[in-house]
C-alpha cells in the first residue's frame, strides 16, 4: 500500500476532522481520482506524435491511455469529428496514490524555477487542476528518447464540498502551494 494512503488514514483524517469539526469519518474529504490529459493537436498531420505521447503517458501513469477524439469538426484547426487529437488516463486506487506521491515528492520539485503551484486553481467544488509544461519532469521518462517536449493537464478530483476543504486536504499531504 502507498505510504501516502497510510498517512491519509492515520493522520490526515484526524487532522481534518478536528479542523472542520466533522461528526463522522465519512464526511472527511478524500481523493477520488486523478485524471491526466495530454492534448496533441499536431497529431492530425503526424500519427506518430500521438503514439509517442500515448507511450509517454503510459510510462508516467503506469496505465494504458485512452485516445481522445475530436467531438466536432473545426475548420480553423483543420480537424474533423472523430479525429484522434489527444490521450487521457484516469487513475484510481493504488496507482492514484503512487502517482500523487511521485508528483509531490519527485516531479514537481524538478520543475525549473519552481516556487509552488497556484493555490487558486480550484473549481469551486474542491477539485484541483494544474498544468505541467514538460513531461520530462517525471523521472520515468528517458530524456534522450523524447521526440518533443509536451505538457499535460492534471486534475485531482476530491469529495470535498468547498475549495477550502479541498485545499486543506491537499495541504495535509504537503502539496507545494505558492505562499
UniProtKB/Swiss-Prot annotation:
Record's keyword annotation contains tRNA-binding: yes
InterPro entries registered for this protein in UniProt: Ribosomal_uL5, Ribosomal_uL5_bac-type, Ribosomal_uL5_C, Ribosomal_uL5_CS, Ribosomal_uL5_dom_sf, Ribosomal_uL5_N
Quaternary structure (record): Part of the 50S ribosomal subunit; part of the 5S rRNA/L5/L18/L25 subcomplex. Contacts the 5S rRNA and the P site tRNA. Forms a bridge to the 30S subunit in the 70S ribosome.
Regions that span the bilayer: none
Organism: Vibrio cholerae serotype O1 (strain ATCC 39315 / El Tor Inaba N16961)
GO molecular function: RNA binding; rRNA binding; structural constituent of ribosome; tRNA binding
Gene3D superfamilies named in the record: 3.30.1440.10
Matches recorded under HAMAP family: Ribosomal_uL5_B
Keywords: Ribonucleoprotein, Ribosomal protein, RNA-binding, rRNA-binding, tRNA-binding
Record NCBIfam families: PRK00010.1
Similarity comment text for this entry: Belongs to the universal ribosomal protein uL5 family.
Domain of life, source organism: Bacteria
Biological-process GO terms, alphabetical: translation
Pfam families: Ribosomal_L5, Ribosomal_L5_C
The protein's role, per its UniProt record: This is one of the proteins that bind and probably mediate the attachment of the 5S RNA into the large ribosomal subunit, where it forms part of the central protuberance. In the 70S ribosome it contacts protein S13 of the 30S subunit (bridge B1b), connecting the 2 subunits; this bridge is implicated in subunit movement. Contacts the P site tRNA; the 5S rRNA and some of its associated proteins might help stabilize positioning of ribosome-bound tRNAs.
An example Gene Ontology CC term for this record: cytosolic large ribosomal subunit
UniProt keyword annotation of Thylakoid present: no
Name of the molecule in the record: Large ribosomal subunit protein uL5
Amino acid at each position: 500500500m502507498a505510504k501516502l494512503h497510510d498517512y491519509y488514514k492515520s493522520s490526515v483524517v484526524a487532522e481534518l476532522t478536528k479542523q472542520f469539526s466533522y461528526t463522522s469519518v465519512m464526511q472527511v474529504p478524500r481523493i477520488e481520482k486523478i485524471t491526466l490529459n495530454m492534448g496533441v493537436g499536431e497529431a492530425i498531420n503526424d500519427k506518430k506524435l500521438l503514439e509517442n505521447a500515448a507511450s509517454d503517458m503510459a510510462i508516467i501513469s503506469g496505465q494504458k491511455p485512452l485516445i481522445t477524439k475530436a467531438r466536432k469538426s473545426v475548420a480553423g484547426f483543420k480537424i474533423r469529428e472523430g479525429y484522434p487529437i489527444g490521450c487521457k488516463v484516469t487513475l484510481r486506487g493504488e496507482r492514484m496514490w503512487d502517482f500523487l506521491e511521485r508528483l509531490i515528492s519527485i516531479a514537481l520539485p524538478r520543475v525549473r524555477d519552481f516556487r509552488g503551484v497556484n493555490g487558486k486553481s480550484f473549481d469551486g467544488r474542491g477539485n484541483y487542476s494544474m498544468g505541467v509544461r514538460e513531461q520530462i519532469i517525471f523521472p520515468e521518462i528517458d530524456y534522450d528518447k523524447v521526440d518533443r517536449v509536451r505538457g499535460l493537464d492534471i486534475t485531482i478530483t476530491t469529495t470535498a464540498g468547498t475549495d477550502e476543504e479541498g485545499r486543506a486536504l491537499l495541504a495535509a499531504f504537503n502539496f507545494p502551494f505558492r505562499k
